[in-house]
């Protein structure tokens, strides 16, 4: 339990406001139903975040930006996440999209299909809200947003 004198209290209020603003933006810029409670967000050091996401599985050396834990309905961000950086805000939006997909019980043939709308919406958000161009590799996006072997 946090109290108004606790320094974490103010940060929790700021996060609630940021998440609410991102969900309002998402509702206005997509066909997703965002009429739901806001997600819980947890911050972890990079190594702990990767351990929680990958477990003992081998993974690339590319840093994990964040993830949405579907089992616990929690967005996990690195403890280096900064609310003043447009990219970091867009990463949070990306994970909020996964939360909204999950809460709306949207069915996918595979987990990769969850990425189909996230990258374009993240790009639109960066351009529209922060005037930041993000020209991601569309072939890479296609590869990671479709089921392996066509399933």
Predicted regions and their residues:
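Soluble non-cytosolic domains of exported or imported proteins
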Residues: 13-17, 82-91, 108-116
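Short, Lys/Arg-enriched N-terminal segments with co-localized hydrophobic residues
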Residues: 2-14
